[in-house]
Amino acid sequence: MPSEIAVEKKKLKNPPLQLHYLGDRVLRQPAKRITKVDDETRQLIRDMLQTMYSSDGIGLAAPQVGINKQLIVIDCEPDNPANPPLILINPTIKQVSREICSAQEGCLSIPGVYMDVKRPEVVEVAYKDENGRPQTLKATDLLGRCIQHEMDHLNGVVFVDRVDNSLTLAQELSKNGFSYQAVKPVA
């Protein structure tokens, strides 16, 4: 369900929130559930959206801005003013497809690094919207991948943990100023 929260899709010189990068402990902590969706939560959503748009991103999880909460904002069409963002509060994956596909991913918390990641082709997720209403969504393609990528952040996982080719990954990380020792491979 598209969000009713509206922010201008533009780059700010000084975004409201600071991004955290690979190696920062906050990215490795499991996020806490949001117990009450209120005006403070909605302001955080606005700030996260503005930070995401300012950073040329299509998805952002609260841990990436140092906030240990289960909150995700996504906009797969940031250049389309008519396309509203998707807000997911306390999301849980209900079902994934058996079909796996590989595609290149990047991350605002690991700038400059783009690697192929295998993920289920289809994901069904349950979540609350910005008004605290329960929602479910079945997603494929870029949106499905983005939801899975951002949900990983809520569990202390970053996309490089899912990369198979460790040699190429180590080279890419090093080339962009990151240490391979920050990677924690997941099965």
UniProtKB/Swiss-Prot annotation:
<comment type="similarity">
    <text>Belongs to the polypeptide deformylase family.</text>
</comment>
<feature type="binding site">
    <location>
        <position position="107"/>
    </location>
    <ligand>
        <name>Fe cation</name>
    </ligand>
</feature>
<feature type="active site">
    <location>
        <position position="150"/>
    </location>
</feature>
<dbReference type="InterPro" id="IPR023635">
    <property type="entry name" value="Peptide_deformylase"/>
</dbReference>
<protein>
    <recommendedName>
        <fullName>Peptide deformylase 1</fullName>
        <ecNumber>3.5.1.88</ecNumber>
    </recommendedName>
</protein>
<feature type="binding site">
    <location>
        <position position="153"/>
    </location>
    <ligand>
        <name>Fe cation</name>
    </ligand>
</feature>
<dbReference type="GO" id="GO:0046872">
    <property type="term" value="F:metal ion binding"/>
</dbReference>
<comment type="function">
    <text>Removes the formyl group from the N-terminal Met of newly synthesized proteins. Requires at least a dipeptide for an efficient rate of reaction. N-terminal L-methionine is a prerequisite for activity but the enzyme has broad specificity at other positions.</text>
</comment>
<dbReference type="GO" id="GO:0006412">
    <property type="term" value="P:translation"/>
</dbReference>
<keyword id="KW-0408">Iron</keyword>
<dbReference type="GO" id="GO:0042586">
    <property type="term" value="F:peptide deformylase activity"/>
</dbReference>
<dbReference type="GO" id="GO:0043686">
    <property type="term" value="P:co-translational protein modification"/>
</dbReference>
<dbReference type="InterPro" id="IPR036821">
    <property type="entry name" value="Peptide_deformylase_sf"/>
</dbReference>
<keyword id="KW-0648">Protein biosynthesis</keyword>
<keyword id="KW-0378">Hydrolase</keyword>
<dbReference type="Pfam" id="PF01327">
    <property type="entry name" value="Pep_deformylase"/>
</dbReference>
<feature type="binding site">
    <location>
        <position position="149"/>
    </location>
    <ligand>
        <name>Fe cation</name>
    </ligand>
</feature>
<keyword id="KW-0479">Metal-binding</keyword>
